[in-house]
Curated annotation (Swiss-Prot):
Family: Belongs to the iron/ascorbate-dependent oxidoreductase family.
Native organism: Dendrobium crumenatum (Tropical pigeon orchid)
Cofactor(s), names only, from the UniProt record: Fe cation
Classification of source organism: Eukaryota, Viridiplantae, Streptophyta, Embryophyta, Tracheophyta
GO biological process, one term: fruit ripening
Protein's pathway: Alkene biosynthesis; ethylene biosynthesis via S-adenosyl-L-methionine; ethylene from S-adenosyl-L-methionine: step 2/2
Catalysed reactions, as listed in the record: 1-aminocyclopropane-1-carboxylate + L-ascorbate + O2 = ethene + L-dehydroascorbate + hydrogen cyanide + CO2 + 2 H2O
Protein name per Swiss-Prot or TrEMBL: 1-aminocyclopropane-1-carboxylate oxidase
Entry-linked InterPro entries: DIOX_N, IPNS-like_FE2OG_OXY, IPNS-like_sf, Oxoglu/Fe-dep_dioxygenase_dom, Plant_2OG-oxidoreductases
Length: 318
């Protein structure tokens, strides 16, 4: 990120553009998020799992999995994930104080952690605007275009314990992310994350203090396909306990999502592809929860039927 402040800014922006257009993923170093709250959040979340979730959820999960994986019979690996998770919501309202067994230290650490990530996500959105030729702040205004004027922002903490038979089950099945821009701190010692590029699965290796960023479905729609969300998955490992902390900066639930008119006009002049649909983000999410592990294209097609019932709403400029 420090390259954006110096003489190599144009080179850094070109790398960012290529990553968004051709990969849907990129990795940030020197991103401005202090290592201390990141390391604290990792520590407290590991302690939280050890003291609470591993005692209940993970134990029940392992007991269930053992019945199938040990025998190798009746395993429906297409409908199972070797993953234990909990979720924290930051915006529009926080639920941290309501999360069971989440102690005060963990909660305050995660609040500080989330505040820095929220600012970083908004900075990244402005960099995307610059590369796209959109007005600064455009993407944030779209995301905040709902009735409360706020985005949806939350964090998913995932734990992937050692798996006795990883050939039978994924840590997390292949999917694209439904929302906007995703910032991931992945485990810096245990690997597993892969992305799909040209029909080939490519490892995203652990790198200490880096943030893996990926494009969600909503940015694909807003950019009218110029930037793509990409299938990714987590491969279960026989050794090591993998933890990841993923923060999702998404549109508000009733925000209306549609291709940026400026991009559509430009592509129309160049006689390029048809436009993506227009829809309310919450409606897309209702479909996504049923089809998360399926291809995204049918979801976009299904949303086209809703175009006629959504009125055009100008995005505020202030």
């Amino acid at each position: 990120m420090e390259l954006l402040e110096g003489s190599r800014r144009s080179d850094a922006m070109a790398v960012l553009r290529d990553a968004c257009e051709n990969w849907g993923f990129f990795e940030l170093l020197n991103h401005g998020i202090s290592h201390e709250p990141n390391e604290q959040s990792e520590t407290v979340n590991k302690e939280h799992y050890r003291e609470h979730y591993r005692r209940f959820r993970e134990q029940r999960f392992k007991e269930f999995a053992a019945k199938t994986l040990d025998s190798g019979e009746n395993v429906d690996g297409d409908n199972l994930d070797w993953e234990s998770t909990f979720f924290l919501r930051h915006l529009p309202t926080s639920n941290i104080s309501q999360v069971p067994d989440l102690d005060e230290d963990c909660g305050s650490t995660m609040k500080e952690f989330a505040l820095g990530l929220e600012k970083l996500a908004e900075r990244l959105l402005d960099l995307l605007c610059e590369n796209l030729g959109l007005e600064k702040g455009y993407l944030k205004r779209v995301f905040c275009g709902g009735s409360d004027g706020l985005p949806t922002f939350g964090t998913k903490v995932s734990n992937y314990p050692p798996c006795p038979k990883p050939e039978l089950i994924k840590g997390l099945r292949a999917h694209t992310d439904a929302g906007g821009i995703i910032l991931l701190f992945q485990d810096d010692t245990v690997s597993g994350l892969q992305l799909l590029k040209d029909e080939e699965w490519i490892d995203v290796p652990p790198m200490r203090h880096s943030i893996v960023v990926n494009i969600g479905d909503q940015l694909e729609v807003i950019t009218n396909g110029k930037y793509k969300s990409v299938m990714h998955r987590v491969v279960a490992q026989t050794n090591g306990n993998r933890m990841s902390i993923a923060s999702f900066y998404n549109p508000g639930s009733d925000a209306v999502i549609f291709p940026a008119p400026e991009l559509v006009e430009k592509e129309a002049a160049e006689k390029k592809k048809e436009t993506y649909p227009k829809f309310v983000f919450e409606d897309y999410m209702k479909l996504y929860v049923r089809q998360k592990f399926e291809a995204k294209e049918p979801r976009f097609e299904a949303m086209k039927t809703m175009d006629a019932v959504i009125s055009s709403q100008p995005i505020p400029t202030a």
